[in-house]
Amino acid sequence: MAFYLETTPSNLPVLDPSEEILLVQDQVGLYFGDEKSFRHNNGTLYLTKKHIFYVDSVDPKKNSLKIKISDIRDVQHTSRYFRSSPKIRLSLRHVEKSWACKICTFINVGDPINPCRNCGVANRFTIIKPKSDARFSQGLCTACTFQNYPDLNTCEICGNQLKNVDRNQLIQLSFRGSGSSKFYEAIKSETDEIEKQRYSNKYDTKVLRKAILEKSLRMGGIHDLEQSHEMQLAKNGRTLVHAFQDLDAFFSLAKDTMSLADQFAEKMDGLTGTQQSDKVQQLLNKSNQLGVLRGNHLDNVPVSANSRLYDIELCKSISEVLRTRLKADTDTVTMTQAWAIYNRSRKANLIPPTRFVKACELIDSMEVGITTSKMNSGLILFQLKTSNHSGKLLSAILEVMNPSTTALKCAMRLHWSIGVTLERLYQAEMDGYIVRDVYEESGSSLLYWKNEFDELSEELTKWFDES
């Protein structure tokens, strides 16, 4: 069944520590049974090894869902037919919320494929039940009382439905755009892997029993114990030798990779004009196929010159990285700093500045927890999206003044760069909240003071009126 999905402020699914996004596809709607869900009419699908995440485009906080891949019993794909979009039909098995361990009778919560949380024994034992007529009673028609074969869905005599299919156990993924075949192959691969794991957990008792028997036959007496200890030491020595050999091979491979990257960069610099764009795209496609470049889930998103899906996912990824850097309400980074921080977190397959700026233009239109502001000089700043953000920045600047401050002291106290500090002080000065004065002793430094001239002028005006 489908469960409620918790999303991040950047409208990305909250992943488990061992999860990573394998595939992304937008313009997808959901069907529960054969009925179209109007609350889940358009969204983005994210596939991992454990879940299928649906993040709604209209209201991601309320309408986002997730499906466990271990709950999927069957996967079917239907292609486009006239005006009907291609769909992936997910038949879900009924998973009990709790199950009792047959060894220690501990009540576990979750999928029965997981081992018991108390004794650690997998749920691979079945209790043999006596034969009865319960199987054949399942095919009894309630309309004409005809005894049908248990696996039939409809009565052979009157055509009455024998089995009630729960609409929550059949979910259809409707792909309004492309990508249904690729997504189906990925889901099918993950479900097959889950079935293999389920089969191995169920039938690995023979292998375990054989290993215990072989170990017990080898061990016997003090001489065998000493021999076993010597064999273990020799095995550990061989393991260390192979490890250092692999480490040397890794370092040599790293040098070759760096030289290959230098040749790659020289070839890029040698191309010009339209030839550069075509050749660059070919080389990037080849390098991605060979696994030379490695990044986050953006590498699984189709990219093109006008790919809005890629820009949206890049915008979400940028906000995720910046939110780890912006802790307080007054923290601020520039566009250049944000670009450097994000590419440093990727480590490879870096984002060019033009693509980064194009994705950042979507930040204010998307609810990702980050907002931008443009200063008078054209400098673009990133900060956390909070209520009355400009008032909080002004209060922070005024608190630094005791009773005056310099740009350097203000930058150190608020953890801003000197450029951002000068922009903020200039903006506050233009708004009339602070004033500047040349520091006479040093001759070059500027002191910023709170603007108390307005209050003084009001008091003087009031005094003259009274007199």
From Swiss-Prot:
Query: Record keywords: Iron included?
Result: no
Q: Which GO terms describe its biological process?
A: late endosome to vacuole transport; protein transport to vacuole involved in ubiquitin-dependent protein catabolic process via the multivesicular body sorting pathway
**PROSITE patterns xrefs:** GLUE
Q: Name one Pfam family in it.
A: Vps36_ESCRT-II
Which residues does the UniProt record annotate as the domain GLUE N-terminal?
5-94
Name residues in a coiled coil. Answer: none
Q: Name one GO molecular function term.
A: ubiquitin binding
Where does the GLUE C-terminal domain lie?
170-203
Would the keyword Metal-binding turn up in this protein's UniProt record? Answer: yes
ZnF regions (RanBP2-type) run across 97-122, 137-161
Gene3D superfamilies referenced in this protein's UniProt entry, alphabetically = Pleckstrin-homology domain (PH domain)/Phosphotyrosine-binding domain (PTB), Winged helix-like DNA-binding domain superfamily/Winged helix DNA-binding domain
Q: Kindly list the GO CC terms recorded for this protein.
A: cytoplasm; ESCRT II complex; Golgi apparatus; late endosome membrane
Keywords per UniProt: Cytoplasm, Golgi apparatus, Metal-binding, Protein transport, Repeat, Transport, Zinc, Zinc-finger
According to the record's subunit comment, the protein's assembly and interactions are: Component of the endosomal sorting required for transport complex II (ESCRT-II). Binds ubiquitin.
In which family does this protein belong, per the annotation?
Answer: Belongs to the VPS36 family.
This chain's function reads: Component of the ESCRT-II complex, which is required for multivesicular body (MVB) formation and sorting of endosomal cargo proteins into MVBs. The MVB pathway mediates delivery of transmembrane proteins into the lumen of the lysosome for degradation. The ESCRT-II complex is probably involved in the recruitment of the ESCRT-III complex. Its ability to bind ubiquitin plays a central role in endosomal sorting of ubiquitinated cargo proteins by the ESCRT complexes. Required for vacuolar sorting of carboxypeptidase S (CPS).
State the domain notes. Answer: The second RanBP2-type zinc-finger is functional and binds ubiquitin.
Identification of the protein by name: Vacuolar protein-sorting-associated protein 36
The gene name on file is vps36
